[in-house]
Amino acid sequence: MKKSPDVFVIAFSLIILAAILTWVLPGGAYEREQVKVGESVREIVKPGSFHTIPSKPQIGSIFTAPAHGFLKLGSIIAFIFIVGGAFNILNDTGAIAAGIGQLVQMLQKRTYLIIPIVMTVFSFFGGAFGMCEEAMPFALILVPMAISLGYDSIVGVCMSFVAAGVGFAAGFMNPFTVQIAQGIAGVPALSGLGYRLVVWAVVTAVTIAWVMAYAARIKANPQRSIMFELDQARRAELEKSAAQHQRFTWRDAMCLVILGIAIAGLIVGVTTLGWYMLELAGLFLAMGVASGLVAAMGPNRVAKSFIAGAKDIAGAALIVGFAGGIIVILENGQILDTILYGMASVTSRLGGVLAAQSMFLLQTVLNFFIPSGSTKAVLTMPLLAPLADLSGVTRQTVVLAYQLGTGFTSMIIPTSGVTVGTMALAKIPYEKWVRWHWPMQVVFAVLSLLALIWPALSGWS
């Protein structure tokens, strides 16, 4: 069997490709202006202001791009290191293994209910609050749970990362995509909520059905899993840990209470206090230290466990830096606006349903180069909203095309620090994730194209 290239080989190859593009494509830029969107001021592009500028080839920056990527995505990298260390402390307490054992005993033959319940919750958080990076640490809980239930690590990642990603993409009130895009497009905040709820419900249901069908196949025959060999070692570790912690003690219960408090703190902090990566890193660090002390591990053992966890997750932090390097090359080469201008020019020639669907495809392609949803909103919505008026579709439809094109492919592109970071946390090689996940991306694309037909034909606003 031909061996797939390592994720670092893929990332560095993309850095080289991005550098070559800075030689091939002409430099270009839109003029920017500051506008108030909601309670914040954002810098958006001015329609019709594109002009060529001298290109800045980045061939000489190929080897410095990863370091610049570390600086650009430093908060995510710090988050990964601290979360990896903190959850390793929690894992070493044995509370996770003991808790999973208790859960399996309680549910007995109803363990299949865990998948739809957990996925619905994460999808709701993605759709309502824009949960994305915040879902990363849950892979460290749900992957071991999935393996203990007889599934594989893919199912564990789907329960949190994919579910939150689907909710983020089809979000009905996502503050980082829907609300920003509506503000820039001049559409009333949270308008069109009814149809967005329908789209979210359909996409979430299809995703849950897909994952449950896959999980049933793996439980019936574990060797069908693309992760079978890699999961075997983790399964053995979980069984060993469960054997060592056959009794569910009060210390285990207290550690799980601390975990629950941390999760509640995450929800409150993100939704009401404006917490982001650094605050959440501090929250999980406190959780790890507290659980270690409650489990009577002692300060030195807690420190050693934290270092071991951070060391184990170093590859995740490194690959995030490489992914950031790709974006740095494109930004410094001043070709992102050129790419945006070229794609918008193609979209402007279409009308009706084709216009709406082409805008979705435009956002999908741009997502590789600009994986940030809010950044893409301020870049593309000032251009596409006026195009909507000329193409015979509503601006509300353009917002929907934007959010669908922005969200789904974020779960597979190598330029997303969240994606490559989550895969590393879950110990799923990126190339295996792509092999497993790409058919789901095809389904998401078809659902998105279908979801845009009614709004384009009905004048949805």
State where each predicted segment sits.
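Hydrophobic alpha-helical transmembrane segments of multi-pass integral membrane proteins
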Residues: 81, 110-141, 320-330, 345-386, ...
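Core transmembrane alpha-helical segments of multi-pass membrane transporters/permeases
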Residues: 7-16, 42-97, 275-338
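C-terminal transmembrane helix pair
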Residues: 5, 347-461
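Short helix-coil transition sites and intra-membrane helix breaks within transmembrane domains
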Residues: 72-76, 87-98, 126-137, 168-173, ...
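Membrane-core helix-loop-helix motifs of multi-pass transport proteins
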Residues: 1-6, 10, 139-229, 245-253, ...
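Hydrophobic core segments of alpha-helical transmembrane domains in multi-pass membrane transport
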Residues: 10-24, 80-88, 121-125, 167, ...
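Membrane-interfacial loop-to-helix junctions in multi-pass transporters
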Residues: 68-77, 104-117, 149-155, 253, ...
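Long, contiguous bundles of hydrophobic transmembrane helices that form the permeation core
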Residues: 2-4, 8, 33-41, 194-305, ...
